[in-house]
Amino acid sequence: MSEAEVPPVARGQAALLGPAEVRALAEEFGVRPTKQLGQNFVHDANTVRRIVATAGVGREDTVLEVGPGLGSLTLALLDVVDKVIAVEIDPNLAARLPVTVADRAPELADRLTVVGADAMRVKPSEIPGEPTALVANLPYNVAVPVLLHLFSELPSLRTALVMVQAEVADRLAASPGSKIYGVPSVKANFFGAVRRAGAVGRAVFWPVPKVESGLVRIDRYAEPPWPVDDAHRRRVFAVIDAAFAQRRKTLRAALGGWAGSPAEAERRLLEAGIAPSARGETLDAAAFVRLAATQP
């Protein structure tokens, strides 16, 4: 069996973090989790192992991690893949992460690259190499914008397995017609197939959050069914935003501002094969793409 065929089994070379280690590191580094940065650190080794296993990443993957914090998930990833790029907005945590990895997984330390940046604004030029998978415990207050930004900016990303607030996970994976189907659902589906990939209880975090968490997986379309260039994406996203800004209204009324008038909105809707009396939550991503194509 070649190296490429070896299944993604942990090397067992990383000493994963437990509750005592997480608190000790936080005290040592002078870290106080803040709501502003959405910091809730995972302190359960079985949970991070499950996340890595569910992500399905292997040796050949270059994994992008956002918000590595104290390094719980980072260590579990390094035990399976050959390269991890961690993007951390907190300068203190960004500086300390390599120290933690060198201490707890010295044989794997050279596989980690830390980028001190805001994941909502990070540019491809700041990311070394071409990451193939996003695996992260995303800061809950910015999870959706970060996810969409990274899929927009990094075409090399083939998959994502992210932990987010359970309610957000449900919205991302919602289907047309659902009460919780909305802007995040459609925009995520613009890039790929989205599905719920599990639940995560509150007890595995420090501090303990007030909400439950969930895992969401996105698999980018191998052959995109529509153009994915930035200009086209912006046109499609503008229609999505307009349709859901007044979600109780018919699309004829809701898209009046986008089209210039309700009458013009009706004309474009009919051209795209969509009933003017329909509402935004009934349309899938393909319908919004057709609608955007009617714009002169």
Curated annotation (Swiss-Prot):
PROSITE patterns: RRNA_A_DIMETH (PS01131), SAM_RNA_A_N6_MT (PS51689). SMART domains: rADc (SM00650). It catalyses: adenosine(1518)/adenosine(1519) in 16S rRNA + 4 S-adenosyl-L-methionine = N(6)-dimethyladenosine(1518)/N(6)-dimethyladenosine(1519) in 16S rRNA + 4 S-adenosyl-L-homocysteine + 4 H(+). S-adenosyl-L-methionine binds at residues 40, 42, 67, 88, 118, 137. It comes from the Bacteria. Gene3D superfamilies: Ribosomal RNA adenine dimethylase-like, domain 2, Vaccinia Virus protein VP39. GO terms for cellular component: cytosol. The keyword Transmembrane helix does not apply. Coiled coil: none annotated. It is found in: Cytoplasm. Keywords: Cytoplasm, Methyltransferase, RNA-binding, rRNA processing, S-adenosyl-L-methionine, Transferase. Its EC number is 2.1.1.182. The keyword S-adenosyl-L-methionine applies. It is an enzyme of class 2 (transferase). GO terms for molecular function: 16S rRNA (adenine(1518)-N(6)/adenine(1519)-N(6))-dimethyltransferase activity; RNA binding. HAMAP family: 16SrRNA_methyltr_A. Specifically dimethylates two adjacent adenosines (A1518 and A1519) in the loop of a conserved hairpin near the 3'-end of 16S rRNA in the 30S particle. May play a critical role in biogenesis of 30S subunits. Belongs to the class I-like SAM-binding methyltransferase superfamily. rRNA adenine N(6)-methyltransferase family. RsmA subfamily. PANTHER family: DIMETHYLADENOSINE TRANSFERASE, DIMETHYLADENOSINE TRANSFERASE-RELATED. This is Ribosomal RNA small subunit methyltransferase A. It comes from Rhodococcus jostii (strain RHA1).
